[in-house]
Amino acid sequence: MSATGGAKSFTPPDIAKAKGKAPIVCLTAYTTPIARLLDPHCDVVLVGDSVGMVMHGLPSTLGVTLDMMIMHGKAVRRGLERALMVVDMPFGSYEEGPEQAFRNAARVMAETGCAAVKLEGGESMAETIRFLTGRGIPVMAHVGLTPQAVNAFGGYQVQGRGEDGDRVMRDAQAVAKAGAFSVVLEKVPEPLARRITKEIPIPTIGIGASPACDGQVLVVDDMLGMFTDFRPKFVKRYAELAEAAEAGIAAYAKDVRQRRFPAPEHVFSDMPKPVKGGEAA
C-alpha cells in the first residue's frame, strides 16, 4: 500500500483489501509532531499502549489507563490526514466482557476520532471482537506475544514454538472468523507467521514475525533510536535520534555556560526596526 497520492484517508476496509498486495506500513505515534511525520509514509498509525513505557517511564504496558490512551489519541489525530488511526485498548478496559469492551471502545472512538481499536487475545477474545464489530467498531486483533499478558507468559518470550504453534494458529483463525479486519502477529517463529499469513483471510501485520506478513509495525521510538533502555531483536534502527539529541543538548549547555548563547542575532535592539514605507515596526 501507499499513503501517498490522494487525500482520502485509509479505512479499515481498505486495509482488509490489502491482503496479499503491497505491504502495509505501520508505525506507532503518541504526539502530533510525530504523527505529522508519519502520515505521508504510513498506511496505519497505531496509538500503542507502548506509550506507557517509551513516554511515561512505566516498566510495562500494564499501568496504562484509558485516559492516557485517549489523551495521546487526540494528539495523534490532529497530526493525521491520510493514515488509518488505530488506538490500543489498555489492560483492564475490555477483558471483563463484550459490554465493558464496547462501552470503553465507543468512548475511545468518540473522543479520539480513531477509525478502529486494537485489542490483545485470540480465541478468548473472539466473542468480544464479534460483539464490537457487530456494533460498528472495527477491530485490529493481536496474537502471539501479547504484552498485556506478560505476567501469565512469565516474560516476553517467543510464542508458538513447536506444538504451541497450533495454539497461535487457532488464535489467528478465531479472530479472523470473529470479524477482525487485520491481526498483529508479535514475536512468533518466522515459519509460523508465514503459514498463518497464507492460511487466514485477513492481513497479518508482523512485529518480530516474518517478511511474508501482509505488513509490518514497529514502535517509532525503537526504530528511530529514541528509546534506548533496551533494544528488541526484531528492531532495526533507521536513525539514532537519541545520540543526535544528546549531542545538541550538550552543545547548548556548553554555549550557555560560556555565554556564547544567545548571540547578537538571537536578541533584540531597543531601536525600532525599519519596514517598507519608512514606518517603524
Swiss-Prot record:
It is found in: Cytoplasm. GO terms for cellular component: cytoplasm. The active site is at residue 186. Mg(2+) binds at residues 49, 88, 120. HAMAP family: PanB. SUPFAM superfamilies: Phosphoenolpyruvate/pyruvate domain (SSF51621). InterPro entries: Pantoate_hydroxy_MeTrfase (IPR003700), Pyrv/PenolPyrv_kinase-like_dom (IPR015813), Pyrv_kinase-like_dom_sf (IPR040442). This is 3-methyl-2-oxobutanoate hydroxymethyltransferase. It catalyses: 3-methyl-2-oxobutanoate + (6R)-5,10-methylene-5,6,7,8-tetrahydrofolate + H2O = 2-dehydropantoate + (6S)-5,6,7,8-tetrahydrofolate. One of its GO terms (biological process) is pantothenate biosynthetic process.
